[in-house]
């Protein structure tokens, strides 16, 4: 963050990147895949596919993933989403059982893994960075509640933009790929919880957080 210059410039750049990411996700809430709503457990009749890499999912190539299933009757259920930390003991996707299993390696190649998270397909990371800026401003070494209040306002603007661009109708471009949509509770927790925690002793911060949540 320090490489971006002044705090005001940093927050403005992060906010703009976040808005672009959230608008893109609002228009493709499941990255173009079929909504996977019951995602708390492994679907029946599927096998788990585990990664060989350790790191954060930076990007999922949905076009390439869908093409791999063009002439294949099976379906893919994405467990990992952009921003997920993965390792070889954690399944990144479930695959409908079939005769040929060699496709698993090709499927894994569509999931780009990096050492760090990226804004590209990861709206939650955008909120986490915004919250981090606010928390740094609230640290005893900085003690700048004004910046934290400014960031809270920006966070509310990001979430409002996301809500305004969401559509009740989801366009499914890749019906063989099932993706869980973002959960509103997760978004609120990503942004507001750290700020509320670090600003617990400041009345003005708590008021802003409560107003933002309302």
Named regions from a protein language model:
Residues 2-77, 81, 90-94, 102-214:
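Short basic (Lys/Arg) and small-residue
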Residues 98:
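Short, Lys/Arg-rich nucleic-acid/phosphate-binding segment
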């Amino acid at each position: 963050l320090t490489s971006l210059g002044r705090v005001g410039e940093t927050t403005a750049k992060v906010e703009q990147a976040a808005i672009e990411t959230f608008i893109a996700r609002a228009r493709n809430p499941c990255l173009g895949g079929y909504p996977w709503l019951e995602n708390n457990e492994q679907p029946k009749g599927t096998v788990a596919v585990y990664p060989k890499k350790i790191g954060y999912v930076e990007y999922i190539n949905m076009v390439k993933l869908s093409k791999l299933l063009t002439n294949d009757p099976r379906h893919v259920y994405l467990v990992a989403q952009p921003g997920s930390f993965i390792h070889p003991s954690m399944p990144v996707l479930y695959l409908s059982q079939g005769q040929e299993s060699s496709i698993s390696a090709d499927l894994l190649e569509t999931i780009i893994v990096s050492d760090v998270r990226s804004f590209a397909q990861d709206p939650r990371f955008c909120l986490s960075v915004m919250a981090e800026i606010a928390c740094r401003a609230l640290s005893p070494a900085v003690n700048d509640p004004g910046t934290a209040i400014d960031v809270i306002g920006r966070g509310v603007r990001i979430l409002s933009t996301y809500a305004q661009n969401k559509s009740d109708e989801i366009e499914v471009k890749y019906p063989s790929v099932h993706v869980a949509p973002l959960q509103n509770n997760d978004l609120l927790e990503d942004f507001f919880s750290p700020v509320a925690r670090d600003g617990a002793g400041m009345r003005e911060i708590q008021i802003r957080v409560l107003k933002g949540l309302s």
